[in-house]
Amino acid sequence: MSEMTPREIASELDRFIIGQDKAKRAVAIALRNRWRRMQLDEALRHEVTPKNILMIGPTGVGKTEIARRLAKLANAPFIKVEATKFTEVGYVGKEVDSIIRDLTDSAVKMVRSQAIEKNRYRAEEMAEERILDVLIPPAKNNWGVTESASSSEPSAARQAFRKKLREGQLDDKEIEIELAATPMGVEIMAPPGMEEMTNQLQSMFQNLAGQKQKARKMKIKEAFKLIVEEEAAKLVNPEELKQQAIDAVEQHGIVFIDEVDKICKRGGQSSGPDVSREGVQRDLLPLVEGCTVSTKHGMVKTDHILFIASGAFQVSSPSDLIPELQGRLPIRVELQALTAEDFERILTEPNASLTKQYQALMATEGVSINFSQDGIRKIAESAWRVNETTENIGARRLHTVLERLMEEISYDASERQGETILIDAEYVKQHLDELVADEDLSRFIL
């Protein structure tokens, strides 16, 4: 779990996301409160529930990007889902309980990779010994029993091979080694809502097959990686990992629900059953409030999982959500539409900005691209103008505009090796102005 302060979390998000300081502050405080809660006495800790967040803002302003970056910072079980993928229990489609099952699966994977990484050094030593046993088989006596290497001669040979192995001199040598056979996958088609039963049947068939060894021929470099994974897996206790993963989900889990505005009931609709809108909201209530969900790894309580919902709310408003769900999302954060100045900063400030990406891509062909300050300003203004005159899709418009601008260079790059191309205001005007000015053309092309 991350121990960063709210200010550190916000400044880390600043490296990738421009503006939206209110949203950054809200998620930074929420993430820090997870750590604060764990410092309390157990009796009080149980009473402190997370304050769930609702992010409201037009498309392309950074709602999903904040969630994506938060997942990397949190070092905690995290899942992002679209609310539109779910239907009410009893109807065809995914149930909302599958959110917690998927979150638990990702937690098991995360905890397992951490445990394997912790045991990697020991696993590498064991893998080294197994490869050396293949290269220099231990001597056997007349009864076929392996003797201990007591003489100095085999030991010296083994040490010489060990040195070569560590220096990479034997990487391309091919050996035959016994590795655990991959269990045969059993695909079971089941109706929606029966995923749990399907998982249990698949696990049962895999366990019936047992763990068999299979001789495989491969290069030492490749074999070493596979043996390290196999030996590291033997050093971890699966049951212990499952319990750690369930604890991590219950205490630190974060669920990001995108497109929550699409499950609002809009005015003037028929009064029939609304299984993919209001029905989904009703099913989300117990999850957000706190309930126990059955997963293949065990029972998971959702009382202390943090839920962050987001939506554009262009044709609906947060008040269109059912009142019970509104009450369970107490923190509201409004994200602002992006300006031309924001677009200019997006093109230059983030660690992997679009301009840096294009420069790196063209550098692979030996073409050097330079963006002048007035060129960047012109690109930002063009993108903003198209957003104003057509649909406002936020920062995603920059992808469209830049792709159009770079199309000619990308196509001819392999024939322009060694050239340096300056993209200034004049170049942008020449390639984009006609499209930007013509509203009908920009509607279909940009």
Swiss-Prot record:
GO terms for molecular function: ATP binding; ATP hydrolysis activity; peptidase activity; proteasome-activating activity. InterPro entries: AAA+_ATPase, ATP-dep_Clp_protease_ClpX, ATPase_AAA_core, Clp_ATPase_C, HslU, P-loop_NTPase. It is found in: Cytoplasm. Keywords: ATP-binding, Chaperone, Cytoplasm, Nucleotide-binding. Pfam families: AAA, AAA_2. SUPFAM superfamilies: P-loop containing nucleoside triphosphate hydrolases. It comes from the Bacteria. One of its GO terms (cellular component) is HslUV protease complex. ATP binds at residues 18, 60-65, 258, 324, 396. GO terms for biological process: protein unfolding; proteolysis involved in protein catabolic process. A double ring-shaped homohexamer of HslV is capped on each side by a ring-shaped HslU homohexamer. The assembly of the HslU/HslV complex is dependent on binding of ATP. Belongs to the ClpX chaperone family. HslU subfamily. ATPase subunit of a proteasome-like degradation complex; this subunit has chaperone activity. The binding of ATP and its subsequent hydrolysis by HslU are essential for unfolding of protein substrates subsequently hydrolyzed by HslV. HslU recognizes the N-terminal part of its protein substrates and unfolds these before they are guided to HslV for hydrolysis. This is ATP-dependent protease ATPase subunit HslU. The gene is hslU.
